[in-house]
Amino acid sequence: MLTVISPAKTLDYDTPPVTERFTLPQYLDESQALIQQLRELSPAQISELMHLSDKLAGLNAARFGSWTPDFTPVNAKQALLAFKGDVYTGLDAENLSDDDFSYAQDHLRMLSGLYGLLRPLDLMQPYRLEMGTKLANARGKDLYAFWGTRISEWLNQALADQGDDVLLNLASNEYFSAVKRSALKARVINVDFKDQKNGQYKIISFYAKKARGMMSRFVIQQRISTPDQLKQFDAQGYYYSAEQSKPDHLVFLRDHPSE
């Protein structure tokens, strides 16, 4: 089973990585093509395109300018440790064991607007480029057109390498839309996390994002390999709802949200 998650806007390049192991992103030719195009934009154009403040637009213009295809532990950091935010708070990669990192490297992928698809130990230089960005390019009107069926094909290869055909989708709709289902040779398992509020179970974004990270961690640490085993997930009060679930759409409920 292969798990996919979204990246994060928040990055941490200050905290030293907990492992010295690293690999290089596999699709840097694609990333470089995007960088070359992004370098042609002024900070004001970046601000308008990405709906960023002037300060953030300037920061990302500088990032695009200093980006280099030569990745080292000095100018880059392992993706799973560089991303921060709700999903990655739940995943808590800093406290994974070396064996956990090895398992994650084969069974976890991060979708990315700039890098397409990242493995946990792939070095990543800092960037901001959300998958939903309407960056017109030679392949079409946006990043979905740019990546086309490539991400699906890479996921197919990763699944083939482990002799499996189950893809666990713990990514947001924005990012999983970059996976072309028609080109994907996999059974997709979707998951919802619902918290009780005012007597009803609802998807609450903050909690759901963190839960996606917690389930990713659960899969890694417990070496989960089948959809049925996912039903054992019970972190921080969540429990499987057979009543609300379907074979390829699992629902987990929580009665009393906790931070």
Swiss-Prot record:
<dbReference type="Pfam" id="PF03883">
    <property type="entry name" value="H2O2_YaaD"/>
</dbReference>
<comment type="similarity">
    <text>Belongs to the UPF0246 family.</text>
</comment>
<dbReference type="GO" id="GO:0033194">
    <property type="term" value="P:response to hydroperoxide"/>
</dbReference>
<protein>
    <recommendedName>
        <fullName>UPF0246 protein Pput_4436</fullName>
    </recommendedName>
</protein>
<dbReference type="InterPro" id="IPR005583">
    <property type="entry name" value="YaaA"/>
</dbReference>
<dbReference type="GO" id="GO:0005829">
    <property type="term" value="C:cytosol"/>
</dbReference>
